[in-house]
Amino acid sequence: MLKLGIIGTNIITDQMLDAAKTTGKYELTAVYSRTEEHAEKFGKPYGATQFFDSLEDFFDEGDFDVVYVASPNSLHYEQVRLAIENDKFVIVEKPAFVNPNEFEGIESLLAAHPKARVVEAARHIHTGLFHAAEEQLKQMPVIQGANITVMKYSSRYDKVIAGDKPYPNIFTAEFAGGALMDLGVY
């Protein structure tokens, strides 16, 4: 059983924890959030026993092998960096990093910490549609170019347009949100 720590207490994390539970291979042990109370409120129903509002304490005192990072995009680099420095396995939501310099920094850090691993949680590579497209491409004799359009209407967009901003990190450049950064990977 792999011990799992999480950074980010949101609907994506709920979905990931539900999926992890179905494998029978993960046990949630530690939760980091901006407040310890929120970490406990989120993590207790999943069986977590350690709750943190300090990233340093989370990594120093948390009992986990794998950390799942589902925070605002702009925070991924620093959180993944700390995980690597603590020789953790990392599953980070997409986009893992917001620019090439961050990726290169993590790549260098991984070379110095061979026990650590980083995986981007890019679910599209596991969908039937992706595999169907992959098979179709294999059957084509020559590919000289492609134009593929993927559209997704955000369930949060109407609230933002109405002036209600319950998710400040979703559509702002400050948190590396918006259509290109958040959905552009698809």
Cite the ranges covered by each PLM segment.
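N-terminal Rossmann-like dinucleotide-binding module
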Residues: 1-46
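Beta-loop-alpha module in the N-terminal Rossmann-like domain of NAD(P)-dependent dehydrogenases
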Residues: 46-109
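Rossmann-fold dehydrogenase core element
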Residues: 105-124, 142-146
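Predominantly a Rossmann-like dinucleotide-binding segment in NAD(P)-dependent oxidoreductases
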Residues: 127-186
